[in-house]
């Protein structure tokens, strides 16, 4: 099917991956020390532990006929640097990121935090999905729902 002169509007998704390192401790102030230890196990260590997180951010939208892009990947890289790397890389999530003062720093909540931060800097309506790899086997996908 030809797109020349047909006015066809094509939608696409574009993803970019980054990595950051951070430490945290899984602990809920709503649970006793015994309940925290039972629920979170070794991840409840009072000294915390760290991860090398991988994050895949997916945006979606119409492919611009003039540029051939949904979004310039250089721009997406800048947005991700501002919304993810600056606040999270080489940080203790529980101590250095105010959001986690009252929110348990599970990977689910890290994904929500990243989504919310990206929503502040990205053009309206383009963010589609945030995928956070805590490890190669532990992955959370969040779509703002």
Curated annotation (Swiss-Prot):
Residues that, per the record, bind Zn(2+): 24, 49, 51
SUPFAM superfamilies referenced in this protein's UniProt entry, alphabetically: Tetrahydrobiopterin biosynthesis enzymes-like
Pathway: Cofactor biosynthesis; tetrahydrobiopterin biosynthesis; tetrahydrobiopterin from 7,8-dihydroneopterin triphosphate: step 1/3
Location of the active site: 43 (proton acceptor), 90 (charge relay system), 134 (charge relay system)
Post-translational modification Phosphoserine, affected residues: 19, 28
Chain segments annotated as coiled-coil in the UniProt record: none
Residues with the Phosphotyrosine modification: 128
The keyword Phosphoprotein appears for this protein: yes
Family: Belongs to the PTPS family.
Extra information: The active site is at the interface between 2 subunits. The proton acceptor Cys is on one subunit, and the charge relay system is on the other subunit.
Disorder noted: Hyperphenylalaninemia, BH4-deficient, A: An autosomal recessive disorder characterized by hyperphenylalaninemia, depletion of the neurotransmitters dopamine and serotonin, and progressive cognitive and motor deficits. Neurological symptoms are unresponsive to the classic phenylalanine-low diet.
Alphabetized PANTHER family for the sequence: 6-PYRUVOYL TETRAHYDROBIOPTERIN SYNTHASE, PYRUVOYL TETRAHYDROBIOPTERIN SYNTHASE
Protein name: 6-pyruvoyl tetrahydrobiopterin synthase
Organism: Homo sapiens
């Amino acid at each position: 099917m030809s797109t020349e002169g047909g006015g066809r509007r094509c939608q696409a998704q574009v993803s970019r991956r980054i990595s950051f390192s951070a430490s945290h401790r899984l602990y809920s102030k709503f649970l006793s020390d015994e309940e925290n230890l039972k629920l979170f196990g070794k991840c409840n260590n009072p000294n915390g532990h760290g991860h090398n997180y991988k994050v895949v951010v997916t945006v979606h939208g119409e492919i611009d006929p003039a540029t051939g892009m949904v979004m310039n990947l250089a721009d997406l890289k800048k947005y991700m640097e501002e919304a993810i790397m600056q606040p999270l890389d080489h940080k203790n999530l529980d101590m250095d990121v105010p959001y986690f003062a009252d929110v348990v720093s599970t990977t689910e909540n890290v994904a929500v935090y990243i989504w919310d931060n990206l929503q502040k800097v990205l053009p309206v309506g383009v963010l589609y999905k945030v995928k956070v790899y805590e490890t190669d086997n532990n992955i959370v996908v969040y779509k703002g729902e």
